Amino acid sequence: MSATPDPRSFGKVAVLMGGTSAERDISLMSGGGVLKALQDAGVDAHAFDPKDHELVELRRQGFQRCFIALHGRHGEDGTVQGALELLRIPYTGSGVMASAIAMDKIMTKRVWLAEGLPTPRYVRLAPDEQTPERVRGVPDDLGLPLIVKPPREGSSIGVTKVLGYSQMQDAVALSARHDPDVLCEEFIDGAEVTCPVLGEGANARALPVIRIVPPEAGYDYQNKYFTDEVKYLCPSGLPADEEAEIQRIVLAAYRALGCRGWGRADLMIRASDRKPFLLEMNTSPGMTGHSLVPMSAKAAGLGYEQLCLHILQGAALDA
C-alpha cells in the first residue's frame, strides 16, 4: 500500500453525501464520518449534497477531487460518475461502466457467470413476466426457500425470503415497488460473509473476511444500521484456506467487473459443502459506525482516518 501524501496536496475536496436514493440516510451517516476524518487529517474537505446542489457547482466552487459517499441510485450506479467525468473532477471508487454494472445484480451475475465465478441460480422477472402464472412457477425453477429482491437496490431494501408458494406474489409486488425488474434467487443455506477490496487491477488487495451472524429476525435494513443485534466477526473464525479462497474469488469478481479504488463483495458459504457463492459487489460501501469496510481495514492495521485518505488518494477519472 502506497504512502499517504500530504493531505494538503489533495486540494479542495467535496464529500458527496445524501443524494436522492432510498439509502439517503445511510449516505449522510457515511459522508459525515468521512468528512470528519478528512478534516481531522488536514484535508480541505467540504460536504456536498447532490439533492440540494447541481453537480456543475462542483466546478464553479473550485473542487479538485470528490469522495463519493453516496449509496444506491444516482450515486453508486454510474450516473454521478459520468457527470464527474464530464466535469473532469477525479472521484473515488469505480468508474462509469463498473459502477453501472455492479449496481444491477442481474448484469453482475451475467458477468460473473461468464467468468466462471460462483453465484446463486436466478430468474429475472421483467414487468411483463410478473403474471400470477409465471410468478407461481418460479419456485419450481429455483426451489424453496428462495430470495426475491430488486436488482438495483441495496441495504436489503425490498428483499423477501419466500418460504412457500403463497408468498410469491406479495414478494414480487414488494420488490417491484422499488424496481420494475424483479430478481428471484436461489437461497443458499449457510454463513453470510463479506470481503472488502482496496486498489485496482493487479494491485488490488482483499482485506480480512467478516462473518455476519444475524439475529433470528434476519439481516435487514434496520438491523444493518440501527441496532447492535447483528454480530460481526473479524477475524472471521473461518479456516485459513477457506478465507483465502473467499479472498481469491472476491478479487476475481472485483476485477471481472472492472472495479477500482475500493469495494466490498457479499457472499454466502453453503453449509452442505462449504462452497462460497457471490451475491453482489458494492462499489460505494457504507462508512458508518456499523459499516464493515472500516472494521475489516482496522483488522488489517488501517485505521478509519488512514482508510479515508487511502481511498481519496485513489481518486481518478476513467480516461
Swiss-Prot record:
Xref: InterPro entries: ATP-grasp, ATP_grasp_subdomain_1, D-Ala_lig_Van_CS, D_ala_D_ala, Dala_Dala_lig_C, Dala_Dala_lig_N, PreATP-grasp_dom_sf
Keywords for this protein: ATP-binding, Cell shape, Cell wall biogenesis/degradation, Cytoplasm, Ligase, Magnesium, Manganese, Metal-binding, Nucleotide-binding, Peptidoglycan synthesis
Residues where Mg(2+) 1 binds: 266, 280
Positions that bind Mg(2+) 2: 280, 282
Residue intervals of the ATP-grasp domain: 109-313
Enzyme class at the top of the EC tree: ligase
Entry annotated with the keyword Translocase: no
Protein's pathway: Cell wall biogenesis; peptidoglycan biosynthesis
GO cellular component, one term: cytosol
Cofactor: Mg(2+); Mn(2+)
EC numbers for this chain: 6.3.2.4
Subcellular location: Cytoplasm
Catalyzed reactions per annotation: 2 D-alanine + ATP = D-alanyl-D-alanine + ADP + phosphate + H(+)
Cofactor note: Binds 2 magnesium or manganese ions per subunit.
Domain of life according to the entry: Bacteria
GO biological process terms, semicolon-separated: cell wall organization; peptidoglycan biosynthetic process; regulation of cell shape
Protein family according to the UniProt entry: Belongs to the D-alanine--D-alanine ligase family.
Main function: Cell wall formation.
Protein name in UniProt: D-alanine--D-alanine ligase
